[in-house]
A protein has these predicted regions:
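Hydrophobic residues in beta-strands of the RecA-like P-loop NTPase core, especially within AAA+ ATPase
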Residues: 65-67
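Short beta->alpha connector loops
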Residues: 8-10, 69-72
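Conserved P-loop
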Residues: 1-58
Length: 93
């Protein structure tokens, strides 16, 4: 799995759009309206953008690029299981 890592404002979202275009992938995010505006401003009108609720209609073999994966995961856990995520851990490259 390819990883895009960087600080806030370092171009991670742009790299997600680039990766999605190159791989023929969709972009999964927490707010598709805001992401659509960003994509359009950056010239990525061809990229499909979805939220978790849209994933049930996505083809099983569809490639997905996840923007801000920790927030997407947190939102999924909190909505699906009515929990409040307090902390997470992850392994750095």
């Amino acid at each position: 799995m390819y990883q895009i890592v960087g600080k806030r404002g370092s171009g991670k979202t742009t790299k997600c759009f680039e990766r999605a275009r190159k791989q023929g992938a969709i972009v999964l995010c927490t707010n598709k309206r805001a992401m659509r505006v960003t994509a359009d401003e950056l010239g990525y009108q061809d990229i499909e953008i979805v939220e978790l609720a849209d994933m049930k209609d996505t083809a099983r073999d569809q490639k997905v690029v996840v923007d801000e994966a920790l927030y997407v995961f947190k939102n999924w856990l909190e909505k699906a299981f009515s929990v409040k995520v307090d902390a997470i851990s992850f392994t750095e490259n």
